[in-house]
Amino acid sequence: MEIQKKIEGDKLTVALKGRLDAVTAIEFDKDIAKNLDGVKNLILDLANLEYIASAGLRILLKLQKKMNTQGDMKIKNVTRDVREVLDMTGFSRLLSIEEADAPKKLTFNF
């Protein structure tokens, strides 16, 4: 999995490419934890995320809980396959997801 980050003031935008599974979720958790101090607005761009496993869902929930205490988190550009997983597991009700009818604006080009 590839992770790209952009910090603008108290806003952190993170784009993920590849698979967020049991192995890469550990890497992602460690990577993002180092960057959350002072962040009030976290944007996760999932346009290039092909797959998410339960370990990845756990990280998203953990991030949402953390950001609820220090600001907000929004997930955007969710692929159809990832959205299906979020819907089937009920996570789409727990996470702030930008709706698919919003125009896609890619954060990074991988």
Describe these PLM feature segments.
Residues 1-52, 62-110:
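STAS-like cytosolic regulatory interaction modules
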